[in-house]
């Protein structure tokens, strides 16, 4: 190769790499992250923290139930033991980078793999960053009391890929990456990444199967039958261990118990995720139309099959669930494929629109304005959590949590105030609460209560039960529900101050020796010792029973 061509090739690769790294950094900053430990992290980090033997979490009941995400928990355990908790921010940023890379793959494909034009890519990236930015979402909530941009990156039923923080659902980016790679003829790597999502989080096994079937139909229609069979076999080999783990560890303990546990999950704890009659509102309908628009734009391309098949299979199983009201099917979330197809649709539609406008864009010289916009969004994305304009937590809990973290002992077990919402009657549609002010967040009956969510991970102490964090094995779900009812009953009796001696004996029988109450609660102190009090909470220690 002539020297000048080698130099141009090297410069091209350098420019592309530099643009990619800078774009990912700006996207991660603009998208933003919630502080540790936020929302679902308090459930999904627990098994990892328990395995790492942090504090006295090995004594926590929930931390010792069957783990639905063992590989994720293993990563959490290793990271918190050998590195530092801040590594979780980096893990999430890497997955955010995969998300943006998928958008670039889609845009590059639409431009027929033409020479890299930095101005065009900068404009595409800036608009994509804007759509997904924390700043736009914050502004939407302030203007309309709803986070509307969220619905361009999330699926129906309150299900999504990225969200606010590092958690198992993030691995759905590998389904998106699989689809993106297949669209540029990387069939084997597409299959591997699609399966990787299901390996890391079994909830993606069904959606992954939809996508693999779409791959196979595409290849069959393209006359590549042997390759279609090959990727089917490869996919089966890759996901078999995960399927066996799920089947072996979450098989029914008994037919009646399994049925009852599913009923609790579907109609009591997860109705906003499980019942189409609750989540199918006008926004969800628009999201479905958004997916259909992306399919329409691909109507003259063979790639149509790759997206159409998972969409139709998800829709078909959703209709079957609605018709049969089958709880098992509801808990498989066939509509969860929308959490992949909606952001993919956004990428496709944006790529198609900008490609149509290419002649006009070339005259604009958009590089500098695009970079400036991206930098502004990145700075705002950093500012939002720093100034507590989003991802807010109940900071009035910090005092009591810090006290417990410092003063806990190995025999302690804590009873917290339990707030049990009626989600089946208060939920309609889906929403993101990441940018709600704390006052509205704590009073919105559509949101799972956020009270004391951080207790286990922050204080590293075991508690008896809470509503937010749940197990998934049927026997554990039944035990969770039993504990929840007991906690509600005890809480009512504490406030009524009825038969306190009998109540305390029941608590001692469950090995509960500490009670957290609101600051305005005064309890009879003959059998209790006040260990902590501030303007928000009190901590009571149950004295040891007197010998008869």
Predicted regions and their residues:
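Transmembrane catalytic cores of multi-pass membrane glycosyltransferases
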Residues: 28-45, 50-52, 56-57, 61-69, ...
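Membrane-interface transmembrane helices that cradle and orient dolichyl/undecaprenyl
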Residues: 163-189, 221
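Active-site lumenal/periplasmic loops and adjacent helix-entry segments of GT-C-fold
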Residues: 24-100, 112-126, 137-171, 202-203
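Start-transfer (signal-anchor) and selected internal transmembrane alpha helices
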Residues: 1-27, 115-123, 548
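Extracytoplasmic
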Residues: 386-548
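Membrane-interface junctions at the ends of membrane-embedded or membrane-associated helices
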Residues: 1-14, 110, 183-188, 217-229, ...
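Signature aromatic-anchored transmembrane alpha helix within multi-pass, membrane-resident enzymes
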Residues: 233-236, 357-383
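Membrane-interface alpha helices of multi-pass inner-membrane proteins
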Residues: 179-181, 189-202, 211-213, 235-237
């Amino acid at each position: 190769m002539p020297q000048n061509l080698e130099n141009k090739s090297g410069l091209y690769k350098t420019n592309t790499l530099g643009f990619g790294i800078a774009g990912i950094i700006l996207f991660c900053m603009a998208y933003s992250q919630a502080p540790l430990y936020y929302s679902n992290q308090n459930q999904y980090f627990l098994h990892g923290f328990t395995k790492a033997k942090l504090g006295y979490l090995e004594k926590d009941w929930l931390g010792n139930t069957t783990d639905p995400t063992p590989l994720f928990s293993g990563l959490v355990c290793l990271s918190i033991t050998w590195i530092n908790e801040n590594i979780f921010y980096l893990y999430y940023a890497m997955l955010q980078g995969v998300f943006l890379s998928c958008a670039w793959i889609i845009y590059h494909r639409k431009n027929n793999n033409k020479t890299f034009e930095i101005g065009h890519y900068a404009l595409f990236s800036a608009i994509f960053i804007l759509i997904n930015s924390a700043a736009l979402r914050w502004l939407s909530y302030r203007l309309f009391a709803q986070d509307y941009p969220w619905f361009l990156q999330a699926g129906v039923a309150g299900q999504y890929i990225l969200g606010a923080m590092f958690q198992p659902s993030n691995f759905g980016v590998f389904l998106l990456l699989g689809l993106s790679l297949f669209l540029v003829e990387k069939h084997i790597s597409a299959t591997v990444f699609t399966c990787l999502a299901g390996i890391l989080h079994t909830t993606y096994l069904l959606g992954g199967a939809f996508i693999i079937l779409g791959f196979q139909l595409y290849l069959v229609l393209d006359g590549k039958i042997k390759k279609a069979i090959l990727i089917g076999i490869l996919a089966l080999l890759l996901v078999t261990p995960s399927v066996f783990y799920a089947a072996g560890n979450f098989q029914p303990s008994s037919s009646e118990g399994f049925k009852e546990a599913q009923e609790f999950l579907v109609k009591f704890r997860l109705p906003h995720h499980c019942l189409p009659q609750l989540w199918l509102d006008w926004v969800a309908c628009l999201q479905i139309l958004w997916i259909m628009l992306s399919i329409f734009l691909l109507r003259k391309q063979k790639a149509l099959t790759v997206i159409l098949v998972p969409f139709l299979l998800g829709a078909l199983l959703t209709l079957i669930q609605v018709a049969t009201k089958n709880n098992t099917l509801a808990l498989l979330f066939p509509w969860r494929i929308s959490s992949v197809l909606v952001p993919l649709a956004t990428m496709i539609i944006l790529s198609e629109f900008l490609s149509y406008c290419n002649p006009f864009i070339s005259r604009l010289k958009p590089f500098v304005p695009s970079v400036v916009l991206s930098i502004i969004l990145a700075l705002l994305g950093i500012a939002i959590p720093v100034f507590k304009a989003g991802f807010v937590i109940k900071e009035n809990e910090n005092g009591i949590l810090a006290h417990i973290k410092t003063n806990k002992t190995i025999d302690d077990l804590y009873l917290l105030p339990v707030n049990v919402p009626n989600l089946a009657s208060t939920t309609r549609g889906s929403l993101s609460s990441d940018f709600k002010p704390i006052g509205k967040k704590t009073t919105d009956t559509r949101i799972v209560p956020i009270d004391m969510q951080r207790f286990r991970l922050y204080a590293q102490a075991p508690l008896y039960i809470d509503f937010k964090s749940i197990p998934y094995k049927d026997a554990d779900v039944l035990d969770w529900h039993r504990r929840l009812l007991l906690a509600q009953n005890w809480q009512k009796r504490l406030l009524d101050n009825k038969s306190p001696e009998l109540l305390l004996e029941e608590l001692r029988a469950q090995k509960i020796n500490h009670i957290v109450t609101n600051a305005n609660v005064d309890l009879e102190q003959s059998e209790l010792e006040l260990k902590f009090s501030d303007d928000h909470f009190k901590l009571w220690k149950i004295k040891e029973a007197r010998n008869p």
